[in-house]
Amino acid sequence: MPKTVLVVDDDEHLREILSAMLRSSGYEISEAATGTEAVNKAISEKPDLILLDIELPDIKGPDVARAIRNNPASAHIPIIGCSAFFGWEYRKEALEAGMDDYLVKPISLEVIKTKIEEFILTER
């Protein structure tokens, strides 16, 4: 059974490109454009992994990660934060909020696929 990745990004174009690339690699994809939608889908759909943009219009990525971690139904799901912000303080904030990793955009498909496989293969 294919693994499911929840792609969370408010930029529709980036979300569609990333989703299409991951689909072509054999993943099932769910998408969310806001933090609220991401939390709801994480809890209801229980994807195998979440790719989470840090800057969302309603709830910032670290707060989304905290909400996902605080719900028993979704606390186990690996979360990879993605952002154009590259300072160490952003990475630190993401990891302290419960994200499992933090990648700086632009991110190559190979790096994303490697990270997804790393987390999915070492399921909690």
Task: Go through each PLM region and give its residues.
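Short hydrophobic/Thr-rich beta-strand motif most characteristic of the beta2 strand and flanking loop
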Residues: 26-33, 41, 103
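C-terminal output helix
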Residues: 107-116
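The feature encodes the CheY-like receiver
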Residues: 15, 57, 75, 87, ...
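Active-site beta3 strand of CheY-like receiver
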Residues: 45-51, 56
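Two-component/phosphorelay signaling modules centered on CheY-like receiver
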Residues: 12-30
